[in-house]
Regions:
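Transmembrane beta-barrel domains of Gram-negative outer membranes and organellar outer membranes
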Residues: 25-322
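Low-complexity, intrinsically disordered short peptide segments enriched in small/polar/basic residues
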Residues: 10-11, 15, 117
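Local alpha-helix boundary/kink/capping signal
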Residues: 14-17, 252
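C-terminal segment of classical bacterial N-terminal signal peptides
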Residues: 16-24
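Bacterial N-terminal signal peptides that target proteins for export
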Residues: 1-11
Protein backbone atom coordinates (compact mmCIF):
# COMPACT_ATOMS: atom_id res chain seq x y z
CA UNK A 1 0.00 0.00 0.00
CA UNK A 2 1.41 3.44 -0.93
CA UNK A 3 1.77 6.17 1.70
CA UNK A 4 -0.99 8.19 -0.03
CA UNK A 5 -3.46 5.29 0.11
CA UNK A 6 -2.48 4.57 3.71
CA UNK A 7 -3.11 8.20 4.69
CA UNK A 8 -6.48 8.15 2.93
CA UNK A 9 -7.50 4.92 4.65
CA UNK A 10 -6.41 6.28 8.03
CA UNK A 11 -8.43 9.46 7.52
CA UNK A 12 -11.50 7.41 6.59
CA UNK A 13 -11.18 5.32 9.72
CA UNK A 14 -10.81 8.39 11.94
CA UNK A 15 -13.88 9.98 10.33
CA UNK A 16 -15.89 6.81 10.94
CA UNK A 17 -14.77 6.81 14.57
CA UNK A 18 -15.80 10.40 15.10
CA UNK A 19 -19.27 9.83 13.66
CA UNK A 20 -19.83 6.46 15.37
CA UNK A 21 -22.09 6.84 18.44
CA UNK A 22 -21.06 5.56 21.84
CA UNK A 23 -22.24 2.59 23.81
CA UNK A 24 -23.02 -1.07 23.20
CA UNK A 25 -26.34 -2.86 23.06
CA UNK A 26 -25.23 -6.19 24.46
CA UNK A 27 -21.47 -6.46 24.46
CA UNK A 28 -19.74 -6.78 27.85
CA UNK A 29 -22.46 -5.09 29.90
CA UNK A 30 -23.21 -5.35 33.64
CA UNK A 31 -25.79 -2.75 34.57
CA UNK A 32 -24.50 0.64 33.41
CA UNK A 33 -20.96 -0.71 33.04
CA UNK A 34 -19.54 -1.39 29.59
CA UNK A 35 -16.41 -3.52 29.75
CA UNK A 36 -14.19 -3.07 26.68
CA UNK A 37 -12.25 -6.03 25.38
CA UNK A 38 -8.75 -6.06 26.90
CA UNK A 39 -5.83 -6.55 24.52
CA UNK A 40 -3.61 -8.80 26.65
CA UNK A 41 -5.71 -10.87 29.05
CA UNK A 42 -8.98 -12.69 28.40
CA UNK A 43 -12.32 -11.01 29.11
CA UNK A 44 -14.87 -12.29 31.66
CA UNK A 45 -17.95 -11.77 29.52
CA UNK A 46 -19.54 -14.02 26.89
CA UNK A 47 -20.37 -12.26 23.63
CA UNK A 48 -20.23 -12.38 19.85
CA UNK A 49 -17.03 -10.61 18.87
CA UNK A 50 -14.10 -10.65 16.47
CA UNK A 51 -10.55 -9.48 17.16
CA UNK A 52 -8.86 -9.07 13.77
CA UNK A 53 -6.10 -8.26 13.66
CA UNK A 54 -4.20 -8.19 16.92
CA UNK A 55 -0.62 -7.12 16.22
CA UNK A 56 2.38 -7.71 18.49
CA UNK A 57 6.05 -6.78 18.01
CA UNK A 58 9.05 -6.84 20.34
CA UNK A 59 12.82 -7.26 20.18
CA UNK A 60 14.35 -10.04 22.26
CA UNK A 61 17.88 -10.27 23.69
CA UNK A 62 19.91 -13.36 22.87
CA UNK A 63 20.80 -16.18 25.25
CA UNK A 64 22.77 -19.43 25.25
CA UNK A 65 20.21 -21.13 22.99
CA UNK A 66 19.19 -18.39 20.55
CA UNK A 67 20.59 -15.17 19.02
CA UNK A 68 19.05 -11.74 19.62
CA UNK A 69 16.22 -10.91 17.27
CA UNK A 70 12.66 -9.73 16.97
CA UNK A 71 9.24 -11.34 17.20
CA UNK A 72 6.25 -10.22 15.15
CA UNK A 73 2.87 -11.85 15.69
CA UNK A 74 -0.50 -11.30 14.02
CA UNK A 75 -3.51 -13.10 15.47
CA UNK A 76 -7.27 -13.39 15.13
CA UNK A 77 -9.97 -14.50 17.55
CA UNK A 78 -13.67 -15.18 16.92
CA UNK A 79 -16.16 -15.68 19.75
CA UNK A 80 -19.67 -17.03 19.28
CA UNK A 81 -22.47 -17.40 21.84
CA UNK A 82 -24.05 -20.85 21.77
CA UNK A 83 -26.46 -19.89 24.56
CA UNK A 84 -26.81 -16.37 26.04
CA UNK A 85 -24.29 -17.20 28.80
CA UNK A 86 -22.21 -19.90 27.07
CA UNK A 87 -19.78 -19.12 24.28
CA UNK A 88 -17.07 -20.70 22.16
CA UNK A 89 -13.90 -18.94 21.00
CA UNK A 90 -11.61 -19.99 18.14
CA UNK A 91 -8.17 -18.39 17.88
CA UNK A 92 -5.14 -18.64 15.65
CA UNK A 93 -2.00 -16.67 14.92
CA UNK A 94 0.95 -16.19 12.56
CA UNK A 95 4.45 -15.54 13.88
CA UNK A 96 7.66 -14.21 12.31
CA UNK A 97 10.95 -14.92 14.13
CA UNK A 98 13.90 -12.92 12.81
CA UNK A 99 15.98 -14.88 13.46
CA UNK A 100 14.64 -18.12 14.96
CA UNK A 101 16.78 -20.20 17.37
CA UNK A 102 18.23 -22.01 14.33
CA UNK A 103 19.73 -18.72 13.12
CA UNK A 104 17.39 -18.39 10.13
CA UNK A 105 14.28 -16.28 9.66
CA UNK A 106 11.24 -18.48 10.21
CA UNK A 107 7.52 -17.83 9.98
CA UNK A 108 4.33 -19.84 10.21
CA UNK A 109 1.05 -20.49 11.93
CA UNK A 110 0.80 -21.30 15.63
CA UNK A 111 -1.37 -23.97 17.21
CA UNK A 112 -5.13 -23.52 16.97
CA UNK A 113 -6.92 -22.75 20.24
CA UNK A 114 -10.50 -23.31 21.35
CA UNK A 115 -12.10 -21.99 24.56
CA UNK A 116 -15.50 -22.68 26.08
CA UNK A 117 -16.67 -19.96 28.49
CA UNK A 118 -19.67 -19.86 30.83
CA UNK A 119 -20.75 -16.55 32.38
CA UNK A 120 -22.37 -17.86 35.55
CA UNK A 121 -22.90 -14.61 37.49
CA UNK A 122 -23.91 -11.10 36.51
CA UNK A 123 -24.85 -8.33 38.95
CA UNK A 124 -26.20 -5.17 37.35
CA UNK A 125 -26.29 -3.35 40.70
CA UNK A 126 -22.63 -4.07 41.45
CA UNK A 127 -21.44 -4.03 37.81
CA UNK A 128 -19.89 -7.46 38.30
CA UNK A 129 -19.35 -10.45 36.01
CA UNK A 130 -17.93 -13.88 36.90
CA UNK A 131 -17.22 -16.68 34.45
CA UNK A 132 -15.45 -20.02 34.12
CA UNK A 133 -13.58 -21.15 31.02
CA UNK A 134 -11.76 -24.17 29.67
CA UNK A 135 -9.27 -23.74 26.86
CA UNK A 136 -7.61 -26.30 24.62
CA UNK A 137 -4.53 -25.64 22.50
CA UNK A 138 -4.40 -28.34 19.83
CA UNK A 139 -0.81 -29.55 19.73
CA UNK A 140 0.77 -30.18 16.36
CA UNK A 141 -1.53 -27.86 14.41
CA UNK A 142 1.13 -25.14 14.14
CA UNK A 143 4.68 -24.97 12.79
CA UNK A 144 7.31 -26.32 15.13
CA UNK A 145 10.06 -23.96 13.95
CA UNK A 146 8.20 -20.91 15.27
CA UNK A 147 7.63 -22.52 18.68
CA UNK A 148 4.32 -24.36 18.24
CA UNK A 149 4.29 -27.35 20.60
CA UNK A 150 3.50 -30.88 19.42
CA UNK A 151 1.41 -31.67 22.52
CA UNK A 152 -1.98 -30.44 23.70
CA UNK A 153 -2.24 -27.78 26.42
CA UNK A 154 -5.31 -27.43 28.65
CA UNK A 155 -6.29 -24.13 30.27
CA UNK A 156 -9.00 -24.07 32.99
CA UNK A 157 -9.68 -20.53 34.23
CA UNK A 158 -11.81 -18.31 36.45
CA UNK A 159 -12.42 -14.78 35.16
CA UNK A 160 -13.95 -11.69 36.75
CA UNK A 161 -14.88 -8.12 36.04
CA UNK A 162 -16.22 -5.44 38.35
CA UNK A 163 -16.91 -1.73 38.13
CA UNK A 164 -16.80 0.84 40.93
CA UNK A 165 -20.09 2.48 40.02
CA UNK A 166 -21.78 1.52 43.31
CA UNK A 167 -19.39 3.65 45.39
CA UNK A 168 -20.91 6.53 47.42
CA UNK A 169 -21.18 9.99 45.88
CA UNK A 170 -18.17 11.46 47.76
CA UNK A 171 -16.10 9.02 45.66
CA UNK A 172 -17.87 9.88 42.41
CA UNK A 173 -14.62 10.42 40.47
CA UNK A 174 -13.57 6.85 41.25
CA UNK A 175 -16.77 5.36 39.81
CA UNK A 176 -15.44 5.17 36.22
CA UNK A 177 -12.77 2.69 37.40
CA UNK A 178 -13.18 -1.00 36.60
CA UNK A 179 -11.04 -4.11 37.01
CA UNK A 180 -11.07 -7.35 35.03
CA UNK A 181 -8.82 -10.35 35.55
CA UNK A 182 -8.26 -14.07 35.44
CA UNK A 183 -6.57 -16.96 37.21
CA UNK A 184 -5.68 -19.75 34.81
CA UNK A 185 -3.86 -23.06 34.87
CA UNK A 186 -1.70 -23.85 31.83
CA UNK A 187 -1.40 -27.64 31.91
CA UNK A 188 0.70 -29.38 29.24
CA UNK A 189 -0.51 -32.74 28.02
CA UNK A 190 3.06 -34.04 28.09
CA UNK A 191 5.52 -33.65 30.96
CA UNK A 192 8.56 -33.50 28.70
CA UNK A 193 9.88 -33.76 25.15
CA UNK A 194 12.56 -36.30 24.27
CA UNK A 195 15.10 -35.58 21.52
CA UNK A 196 17.27 -38.41 20.21
CA UNK A 197 20.66 -37.84 18.58
CA UNK A 198 23.98 -39.58 17.93
CA UNK A 199 27.21 -38.40 19.54
CA UNK A 200 30.51 -38.15 17.66
CA UNK A 201 31.30 -41.64 18.97
CA UNK A 202 28.07 -43.05 17.58
CA UNK A 203 26.36 -43.37 20.96
CA UNK A 204 22.66 -42.65 21.29
CA UNK A 205 21.98 -39.48 23.30
CA UNK A 206 18.62 -38.58 24.77
CA UNK A 207 17.79 -34.99 25.74
CA UNK A 208 14.66 -34.30 27.77
CA UNK A 209 13.02 -30.85 27.76
CA UNK A 210 10.60 -30.44 30.66
CA UNK A 211 7.18 -28.82 30.22
CA UNK A 212 6.10 -27.27 33.54
CA UNK A 213 2.60 -26.63 34.78
CA UNK A 214 2.10 -22.86 34.90
CA UNK A 215 -0.12 -20.56 36.95
CA UNK A 216 -1.12 -17.77 34.60
CA UNK A 217 -2.82 -14.76 36.14
CA UNK A 218 -3.41 -11.16 35.31
CA UNK A 219 -5.69 -8.18 35.64
CA UNK A 220 -6.59 -4.98 33.84
CA UNK A 221 -7.35 -1.63 35.49
CA UNK A 222 -9.26 0.82 33.32
CA UNK A 223 -10.79 4.28 33.70
CA UNK A 224 -13.82 4.77 31.46
CA UNK A 225 -14.26 8.31 30.15
CA UNK A 226 -17.60 7.26 28.56
CA UNK A 227 -18.80 6.23 32.04
CA UNK A 228 -17.54 9.52 33.49
CA UNK A 229 -19.41 11.54 30.87
CA UNK A 230 -22.66 9.54 31.02
CA UNK A 231 -23.07 8.60 34.68
CA UNK A 232 -20.83 10.85 36.82
CA UNK A 233 -20.47 14.31 35.25
CA UNK A 234 -20.32 15.75 31.77
CA UNK A 235 -16.97 17.53 31.87
CA UNK A 236 -17.24 18.74 28.28
CA UNK A 237 -14.71 16.45 26.62
CA UNK A 238 -14.48 16.52 22.80
CA UNK A 239 -16.44 13.76 21.05
CA UNK A 240 -13.46 11.60 20.13
CA UNK A 241 -11.82 12.00 23.58
CA UNK A 242 -14.91 11.05 25.58
CA UNK A 243 -14.77 7.55 24.07
CA UNK A 244 -11.26 6.82 25.39
CA UNK A 245 -10.57 4.26 28.11
CA UNK A 246 -7.02 4.37 29.56
CA UNK A 247 -5.97 0.87 30.61
CA UNK A 248 -3.07 -0.90 32.32
CA UNK A 249 -2.82 -4.68 32.09
CA UNK A 250 -0.61 -6.97 34.19
CA UNK A 251 0.13 -10.41 32.70
CA UNK A 252 2.13 -12.93 34.79
CA UNK A 253 3.24 -16.54 34.30
CA UNK A 254 4.45 -18.54 37.32
CA UNK A 255 5.91 -21.98 36.45
CA UNK A 256 5.17 -24.40 39.28
CA UNK A 257 7.32 -27.51 38.82
CA UNK A 258 9.72 -29.65 36.72
CA UNK A 259 12.72 -27.45 37.41
CA UNK A 260 11.08 -24.15 36.47
CA UNK A 261 9.48 -23.19 39.81
CA UNK A 262 10.17 -19.56 40.68
CA UNK A 263 11.15 -18.56 37.14
CA UNK A 264 8.42 -15.96 36.78
CA UNK A 265 7.90 -14.01 33.57
CA UNK A 266 5.43 -11.27 32.79
CA UNK A 267 4.66 -7.88 31.36
CA UNK A 268 3.04 -4.57 32.30
CA UNK A 269 0.97 -3.20 29.43
CA UNK A 270 -0.18 0.44 29.65
CA UNK A 271 -2.33 1.68 26.81
CA UNK A 272 -5.49 3.27 25.52
CA UNK A 273 -8.75 1.97 24.02
CA UNK A 274 -11.15 3.89 21.79
CA UNK A 275 -14.59 2.26 22.11
CA UNK A 276 -17.38 3.01 19.65
CA UNK A 277 -20.75 1.39 19.11
CA UNK A 278 -19.64 -1.30 16.68
CA UNK A 279 -15.90 -1.66 17.24
CA UNK A 280 -12.95 -0.54 19.29
CA UNK A 281 -9.30 0.25 18.64
CA UNK A 282 -6.58 -0.45 21.19
CA UNK A 283 -2.87 0.24 21.53
CA UNK A 284 -0.52 -0.81 24.33
CA UNK A 285 3.16 -0.74 25.20
CA UNK A 286 4.68 -4.02 26.43
CA UNK A 287 7.08 -3.62 29.37
CA UNK A 288 8.91 -6.75 30.62
CA UNK A 289 8.89 -7.13 34.41
CA UNK A 290 12.35 -8.76 34.59
CA UNK A 291 15.36 -9.76 32.47
CA UNK A 292 14.01 -13.29 32.15
CA UNK A 293 11.07 -11.88 30.21
CA UNK A 294 13.17 -9.48 28.14
CA UNK A 295 14.84 -6.07 28.11
CA UNK A 296 13.04 -4.21 25.35
CA UNK A 297 9.73 -2.39 25.07
CA UNK A 298 7.25 -3.88 22.62
CA UNK A 299 3.96 -2.77 21.12
CA UNK A 300 0.53 -4.38 20.75
CA UNK A 301 -2.40 -3.08 18.70
CA UNK A 302 -5.87 -4.44 18.03
CA UNK A 303 -9.00 -3.88 15.98
CA UNK A 304 -11.98 -5.46 17.74
CA UNK A 305 -15.52 -5.78 16.35
CA UNK A 306 -18.71 -6.11 18.43
CA UNK A 307 -20.61 -8.60 16.28
CA UNK A 308 -23.54 -8.65 18.71
CA UNK A 309 -24.04 -4.93 17.99
CA UNK A 310 -23.25 -5.06 14.25
CA UNK A 311 -25.52 -8.04 13.52
CA UNK A 312 -27.92 -8.22 16.50
CA UNK A 313 -30.55 -10.29 14.68
CA UNK A 314 -28.32 -12.67 12.69
CA UNK A 315 -24.63 -13.44 13.24
CA UNK A 316 -24.51 -11.57 16.53
CA UNK A 317 -27.18 -13.42 18.48
CA UNK A 318 -26.92 -16.72 20.41
CA UNK A 319 -27.54 -19.91 18.45
CA UNK A 320 -29.99 -21.14 21.08
CA UNK A 321 -31.91 -19.82 24.09
CA UNK A 322 -32.16 -21.62 27.41
Amino acid sequence: MTSRRLASATASVLLTLTLCPAGAAAHGLAGKRFFPSALTIDDPFVSDELSLPTFFHIRQPGDAESPPGQITNVSGEWSKRIFPDLGLTLAGDWTLLDPAPNGRTESGLGNLEMTLKYQFFTSAAHETILSAAFGWEAGGTGRKKIGAESFDVFKPAILFGTGFGDLPEPLAWVKPLAVTGLIEGVLPGRSGNKTFSLSDDGDLEIEVEKNPNVLHWGFAVMYSLPYLQSFVKDVGLPAIIRQLIPIVEIDINNPLDRGFAGKTTGTVNPGIIWAGKHFQLGLEAILPINERTGKNVGIRGQVHFFLDDIFPNTLGKPLFKW
